[in-house]
A protein has these predicted regions:
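C-terminal target-recognition/interaction regions appended to catalytic cores
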Residues: 1-108
Length: 108
């Protein structure tokens, strides 16, 4: 089910206008949390992934940093698209580390 199937969740100006473009454009902010990083974060036309100051999408390294990959982490691919998929589909490493610590405490 998509938002278009639930009219009460739509803004009045979009109700009944199923023929419209549904993607969202937006810019990230330096002082606010990031949008969820998806596999298409390198394209500004697929979400709120425009760089905060520059007129471009995020780089692979910027997306990886938002997802908490270490700065020295190397994605072993020559394809920007595959690297973006790896980053967008990943559980953020810092989240996984913290969750693992909690699970360890509970199981001990």
């Amino acid at each position: 089910m998509a938002w278009k199937d639930i009219p009460h969740l739509q803004l009045d100006c979009y109700r009944g206008r199923d023929d419209r473009f549904r993607d969202v454009y937006g810019r990230l902010f330096w002082d606010k949390p990031s949008s969820t990083i998806t596999t298409k974060f390198i394209k500004i036309s697929n979400g709120r992934f425009a760089h905060p100051d520059e007129n471009r999408g995020l780089s692979i390294r910027e997306g990886a940093t938002i997802q908490s990959f270490p700065k020295e982490y190397i994605f072993k691919t020559n394809s920007i698209g595959i690297a973006a998929k790896l980053i967008g589909n990943a559980v953020p490493p810092e989240y996984a580390r913290r969750l693992g610590k909690i699970i360890n405490k509970v199981e001990v």
